[in-house]
Amino acid sequence: DFDQDKKIESLQNTILNFQSTTAIQYTSNDEFDDSRIDYQDPKFLNTELNYTLNDNSKINIIYNKSANARLGFDQIDTFANSLTLDSSATLSNPYLNYIKKPTNYSFEKHLDYNEKLNTHIIDSSFDESYGVISEYTNTSLKNKFISFSVGYLNEDNAILGSSFSGAFGNLDNSETFFTDSSLAYKMNTNNEILLKMSYANSQANFEDLGLINEFSNIVSSYYSLGYGKKSLLFNNDKSTFSLTRPLKVDSGNIDMAVPKYATSDNEIIRENSNIDLAPDNDQLNLEFNYNINKHNNNFNIGFLSIINNNHSNQSSIENLFKLSYNYLF
């Protein structure tokens, strides 16, 4: 069962002449990896303010961290969620990743000892994008972590990270309604499986359409499966394997009135053209990472194979390899 003891590590910073506490809190347990998180990692270093209410609820303000902070697998310490070669393919909500330079305001309400609801409002300091998400989390099932969320994303001048203007029309913003689910299962002390799935429906809002007559709603999805194993070759090593299909448009089309020719009296004759936004192929990322730390010597080997990059209709395979070494003083 999950051990409900909380571990909190704090670092004092002086900001604007007052003291704030930078803290990252996670659930440690006997089933999932309870090794200490490296708080000096840039992915974790941030300013976080916490306030606990009398009814075991909590208010958090998290600045300059991933928009996925305290959502999904970020709530537990699990070594399988450690993809390193392709940052866009991590086991996190892909839609929230479109919020740049986020500030996360969250409210946690415990329904029971092992159940809670999270409500997050995520604002961007880069543009006018923002998101709202509510998540249900259950850790009462033995060796399992389950979360399910629904949310809303408003992107400024973009839809799923893409923007355009000029003759094609001027995109004002887009609205995306999404669902997201996470499952972690600990088979035994040294083996764990993580599964992440997301689904969304997006609508583009234009200031003016230009050549575009109609821009349909876009249906998109994402999934990733990760497997982690300790002691593959030695007692103090960790290895991870993952299969990811990155975010993909499953359906959507654009209807355009394309100029074909002009008549003698300068009348523009247009021809309607329908563009299918859904690619025929699926991009698949296969990744393997091996890490061993012995006597303060840290070795890491990573291999990433990208099949049909960007969901290209032309079959292709790209391979990336990474080898790193660090010594901890």
Model-derived features: positions:
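Outer membrane beta-barrel translocator domains of Type V secretion systems
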Residues: 3-187, 198
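Beta-barrel outer-membrane channel/assembly domains of diderm bacteria
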Residues: 42, 315-327
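Outer membrane beta-barrel transmembrane domains
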Residues: 92-99, 106-108, 126, 146-173, ...
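C-terminal alpha-helix/helix-terminus motif
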Residues: 11, 327-329
